[in-house]
């Protein structure tokens, strides 16, 4: 039994390190690469991210829903989908037993605004100023157990900046968190 537990621990740590390596690589690539922002249907990106994240909610009593405006904005769709999935994953980790996650996409004059809101634990104001720092984790013991390395929000911040935007955080301890990804890549009327 001890050997089985040790093997499972080694396997889970190996997966965590692999995930960490991939996120570090993503950060390095983002800093060096030029991206072309293409007309993308906001609905397609949000539905894709929600569909990808839904299976990870199976072990918890979490409702995950998406709402969006109909239309196109300029973005790198794979990166924005990754941003949304990372924000959903963080929201899921903030919910202990049951709760709700809502992903909302709105078209703006400059591009789009993607909001991910959860009914999780929330954060203290002093934690909000550091959460996009690479390797920073609000709850180190919990995120280690859940596979977090503290790179997801740093990656999201880079993606937002590539879209001439930013991340905005609002949180109330014990009530939940809202993350707004302001993406100012531009708007378009056609595919």
Language model: regions and residue ranges:
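Short conserved segment of the HATPase_c
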Residues: 123-137
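Short beta-strand/loop element within the Bergerat-fold HATPase_c
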Residues: 98-110
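Acidic ATP/Mg2+-coordinating residue in the GHKL
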Residues: 118
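Conserved micro-motifs of the catalytic ATP-binding
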Residues: 31-36, 68, 72-78
């Amino acid at each position: 039994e001890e050997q089985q537990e040790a093997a499972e621990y080694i396997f889970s740590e190996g997966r965590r390190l692999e995930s960490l390596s991939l996120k570090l690589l993503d950060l390095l690539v983002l800093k060096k690469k030029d991206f072309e922002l293409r007309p993308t249907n906001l609905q397609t990106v949000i539905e894709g991210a929600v569909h990808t994240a839904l299976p990870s909610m199976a072990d918890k009593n979490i409702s995950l829903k998406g709402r969006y405006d109909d239309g196109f904005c300029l973005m790198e769709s794979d990166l924005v989908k990754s941003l949304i999935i990372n924000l959903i994953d963080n929201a899921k980790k903030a919910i202990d037993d049951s709760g709700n996650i809502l992903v909302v996409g709105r078209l703006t004059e400059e591009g789009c605004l993607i909001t991910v809101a959860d009914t999780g634990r929330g954060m203290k104001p002093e934690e909000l100023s550091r959460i996009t720092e690479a390797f920073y984790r609000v709850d180190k013991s919990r995120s280690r157990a859940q596979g977090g390395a503290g790179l997801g929000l740093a990656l999201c911040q880079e993606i937002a900046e590539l879209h001439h935007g930013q991340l905005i955080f609002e949180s109330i301890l014990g009530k939940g968190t809202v993350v707004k990804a302001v993406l100012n890549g531009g708007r378009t009327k056609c595919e």
